[in-house]
Amino acid sequence: MFDKIQDLEIRFQELESLLSDPTVIANQPEFRKLSREHADLAPLIEAFRRYKKVLDELEENQELLADPEMKEMAEEEISRLSQEKERLDAEIKILLLPKDPNDSRDVILEIRAGTGGDESALFSGDLFRMYSRFAEKNRWKVEMLSCSESERGGYKEVIASIEGQDVYAKLKYESGTHRVQRVPETEAQGRIHTSACTVAIMAEAEDVDIDINPADLKIDVYRSSGAGGQHVNTTDSAVRITHIPTGTVVACQEERSQIKNRAKAMKVLKTRILDTIQQEQNAKLAADRKQQVGSGDRSERIRTYNFPQGRMTDHRIGLTLYRLDSIMAGDIEEITDALRAHYQMEALKAQSEGA
């Protein structure tokens, strides 16, 4: 294990040198690629360097045990350092787990109202605000790509791109069915209604990922409807693209420019097709392992938001928090961190069982 990390440490030092090279800095695509590799390695190398320091300090304190005057202090230090060594050992094992190649990617977020009619659409809007505020806290960029608004507020469907560092890594476990329990404003008897929305987090496709034959596309243009000012319904700016082999359909009318709408629709189309391919691969892997991939089942009911009790429960890991207001305001780091830790431990367990 440590031979591998030492090789990675040499690579890390090479990257630090390359990133200060003016030639590399001038080549922005290469600079971004190397910066991403450097950022991916940094946590492991930092943990490894702390681990080596702890080993050196343990050795020094072992030698101090022979000194009667220093023995008691050395024993305390050995106890503390042994715990730190154990913690770092576990941290390094997790950091050495195979990386999800999508973790550093931007994402396409899709939220769709499900059962519950107007209340479900309102909750779709609540979820979109929650993710938007979480994105703000992480300094990510959110761009609306497409939406279908409900008459009473919220969205029947909303699609957005989220760009920034580690977006997919933090949000990938949000895919699934989100259930809400609350009293609608129109409910005179005060009865609690249950409704649901589905969330899909898809790693954004890059041009190298998927090659789409233009002959496989059916492109329709039409006049946009809804918000958009004086240009609405005056030009055929809205675009609908159908990928004939898969039947995938994407429409976009958010921009006044047909060219921009077409580019946004293509971005979503490529991402959906790539996501379908990856979902099929994940399903096969899960079947081979005879276990369900936690981030893969979009039909899985993953979470309940109970407004009368101010409670959020994530059913996959049994996490319950009684601070629903702050969660809906985008404070979901505790949830995303707990999910990542859970699935990392599952991966470690699977790795040790397969060793």
Swiss-Prot record:
Function: Peptide chain release factor 1 directs the termination of translation in response to the peptide chain termination codons UAG and UAA.
Family label: Belongs to the prokaryotic/mitochondrial release factor family.
PTM notes: Methylated by PrmC. Methylation increases the termination efficiency of RF1.
This protein's GO CC annotations: cytoplasm
GO molecular function, one term: translation release factor activity, codon specific
PANTHER family per record: LD18447P
PROSITE patterns in UniProt: RF_PROK_I
Gene: prfA
Residues forming coiled coils: none
Record flagged with keyword Chaperone: no
Keywords: Cytoplasm, Methylation, Protein biosynthesis
SMART domains the UniProt entry points to: PCRF
InterPro entries named in the record: PCRF (IPR005139), Pep_chain_release_fac_I (IPR000352), Pep_chain_release_fac_I_sf (IPR045853), Prokaryotic/Mito_RF (IPR050057), RF-1 (IPR004373)
A Pfam cross-reference name: RF-1
Modified sites of kind N5-methylglutamine: Q230
Protein name as catalogued: Peptide chain release factor 1
Broad class of the protein's primary localization: cytoplasm
Native source organism of the sequence: Trichlorobacter lovleyi (strain ATCC BAA-1151 / DSM 17278 / SZ)
Location in the cell: Cytoplasm
